[in-house]
Amino acid sequence: MSTSAKHTSAPDSFFSASLEQADPEIAAAIKGELGRQRHEVELIASENIVSRAVLEAQGSVMTNKYAEGYPGARYYGGCEFVDVAENLAIERAKKLFGAGFANVQPNSGSQMNQAVFLALLQPGDTFMGLDLAAGGHLTHGATVNMSGKWFKPVHYTVRREDGIIDMDAVAKLAEETRPKLIIAGGSAYSRAWDFKRFREIADSVGAYFMVDMAHFAGLVAGGAHASPVPHAHVCTTTTHKSLRGPRGGLILTNDEALAKKFNSAIFPGLQGGPLMHVIAAKAVAFKEALQPDFKVYAKNVVENAKALAETLRAAGFDLVSGGTDNHLMLVDLRPKGLKGNVSEKALVRAAITCNKNGIPFDPEKPFVTSGLRLGTPAATTRGFGVAEFQQVGNLIAEVLNAIAQSPDGAAPLVEASVKQRVKELTDRFPIYQ
């Protein structure tokens, strides 16, 4: 009997063709994105640059495996190796943050926060979080988000005069509203959080205390930021941003009973099969963050942020709260007569990537804004130090001052000049060679 007949639906190239061969359009888009990352200064506070090892793990054959459930208790066979990966991720996360329990399965930051809500609240329950307009996050009760539609959010904010959270006002609001959950953390707050006081306030009204440390978890892991883990009932974080891992979420707690609730909330409550290739990449990133050089990295992120903030202040720019204690800052553009959207576009043309951002009590709409959010994790990863961030701060000031004098929000000659100097700077700090 002949065995030459083909009995497979896969083409001969299925297991051998490169991306360039199989899909040149997507390959071109990826190549273009690599070029952008190589030649632009990345200042978006929520972005970072992962290691080649993280990329390799995330692009591995673990993408093929379904593994509903948890290690040792799966609903599918053949999970012995993905169990190894997930157990490593769990144990490394626990060690990294000094937590008793960790769930590494959340696919995103939004889903990790939804899981906490599912575990601790009922629809219609009251909870407290920082107002989005003051630097909070969509999942902390924004009206357009599930958290604002299914639950009853009440928001604390910052003082108008200095842009800092008034803890006495937080305590008063908690006493008046008696929330079941109080959230600390946000996406655009540049100052330190008083976790001890927040826990005291939560205890005084019988509320759970949650910290969403998605933005500053890498600083916590590296010892450059106070840890909320000893104070909070639960901490959530994304695994990218300052933690420098793949995109995903993580839930931490020291309470075994709550850990069981969070596990059930993730699976089967919100998710089915976890993304095992991403979990493998999380494990790699956690191992990297456990190394001594990550402490140096975290320290440098904060030092670089302070240097960038001081450079901008010296150049005549106003910063919300006057500066930063972490990795990010908000530039108030109103004294310059500028809008966030126009400023963002001008800086992008000059190869400096950042994002427009609302500032506290912002009169502008979200797609316009009166501010810019700047962060230092990504450029610090590629090797920038204080001197480079001082240079970047001066380049930002050069572009913004130029467009402030322009009737159409553009300054082509200045933007082109800055772009060339950015290229010279980034060429000194190559990535993925």
Swiss-Prot record:
Species name: Rhodopseudomonas palustris (strain HaA2)
Family: Belongs to the SHMT family.
Xref: InterPro entries: PyrdxlP-dep_Trfase, PyrdxlP-dep_Trfase_major, PyrdxlP-dep_Trfase_small, Ser_HO-MeTrfase, Ser_HO-MeTrfase-like, Ser_HO-MeTrfase_PLP_BS, SHMT-like_dom
Names of required cofactors: pyridoxal 5'-phosphate
EC class of the enzyme, as a word: transferase
Function noted in UniProt: Catalyzes the reversible interconversion of serine and glycine with tetrahydrofolate (THF) serving as the one-carbon carrier. This reaction serves as the major source of one-carbon groups required for the biosynthesis of purines, thymidylate, methionine, and other important biomolecules. Also exhibits THF-independent aldolase activity toward beta-hydroxyamino acids, producing glycine and aldehydes, via a retro-aldol mechanism.
Subunit structure: Homodimer.
Pathway: One-carbon metabolism; tetrahydrofolate interconversion; Amino-acid biosynthesis; glycine biosynthesis; glycine from L-serine: step 1/1
Name listed for the protein in its UniProt record: Serine hydroxymethyltransferase
MF terms (GO), sorted A to Z: glycine hydroxymethyltransferase activity; pyridoxal phosphate binding
Modified residues (N6-(pyridoxal phosphate)lysine): K241
Gene Ontology annotations of biological process type: glycine biosynthetic process from serine; tetrahydrofolate interconversion
GO cellular component labels: cytosol
Keywords, ordered alphabetically: Amino-acid biosynthesis, Cytoplasm, One-carbon metabolism, Pyridoxal phosphate, Transferase
Location in or out of the cell: Cytoplasm
Annotated (6S)-5,6,7,8-tetrahydrofolate binding sites: L132, G136, H137, L138
Keyword set includes Transmembrane helix: no
NCBIfam families attached to this UniProt entry: PRK00011.1
SUPFAM superfamilies associated with the record: PLP-dependent transferases
Organism classification: Bacteria, Pseudomonadati, Pseudomonadota, Alphaproteobacteria, Hyphomicrobiales
UniProt KW Cytoplasm keyword: yes
Database matches in PANTHER family: SERINE HYDROXYMETHYLTRANSFERASE, SERINE HYDROXYMETHYLTRANSFERASE 1
Site annotation Plays an important role in substrate specificity: residues: H240
